Amino acid sequence: MTLTDFSAALDAAGLSVAALDAAGADVVHISPSHHYPTGIVMPIARRQELLHWAEREPDRFILEDDYDSEFRFVGRPIPTLFSVDEGGRVIYLNTFSKTIAPSIRISYMVLPHRLLPTFREKLGFYSSTVSGFEQYTLARFMAEGYYEKHLNRMRKRYHQKRDAVIACIRGGPLAERARITEEDAGLHFLMTLDTPLPDGALRRLAAQRGVRLAMLSEYYNDPAAAPPHVLVVNYSGIDIEKLPRALARLAEIWEEQDHA
């Protein structure tokens, strides 16, 4: 079997189905609940379009990676593709890395019934590398209702953390130069900066001041196709007490440009 991988174009609603058709794809890996790094949440209409794409051919499948989906702060959660898939075309993937801890290293996969015989035939020998003790502990944690309570606490904590980070940015020296988007879900958002500097120069000048920036263009196969001056801000790990100093150092870049 030969596998050819490729990237597909995104629009405001997420993955372009027309791009899948043009590429002749049979399998697609997506994160419809909160795409990383763009933060796009795929609307219901596009999800239905994607399911119809999969159903047009007998061996098309969708790998739904629901990573980071548990943290939605505005509106009701959108149903997963797996939950509305009537044709058995969606393979669901998720992990506990965000909701509990990366060190737990436990993820899971839910197969459509039609794939179970093939899985048992081809991969029935597979044994998880995670210790049985950790798996059993997590199972008990969930079965006894503690996981849902923990998740609610984490949602509240990250909601407060997100609000604090955004308030600090909007009340700081970059308030007139920064536009925040895609902040309603997940543990990151985008921040577009008003600057004539190319991304590489902006990142270099920030690094000279001890501030590490993650540019959206770094995630593109073709960086030139990315919208310029957009930062990917993973706010969950930000030290809120150090953020004002980091923003002040970034503001120095504009001050130097204004006096150049």
Question: Which residues make up each language-model segment?
Answer:
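Active-site PLP attachment segment
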Residues: 82-118, 133
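Residue-level detector of anion-binding/catalytic polar loops
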Residues: 61, 211-212
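Catalytic cores of nucleotide-enabled group-transfer and carboxylate-activating enzymes in metabolic
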Residues: 79-80, 120, 138, 169
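Conserved PLP-binding active-site segment of the aspartate aminotransferase-like
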Residues: 111, 190-196, 213-253
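Active-site phosphate-binding strand-loop segment of PLP-dependent enzymes
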Residues: 2-73
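Structural signature of PLP-dependent enzymes
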Residues: 120-123, 144-166
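Conserved glycine-rich beta-strand-loop-beta hairpin in the small C-terminal domain of fold type I
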Residues: 156-166, 178-192, 202-205
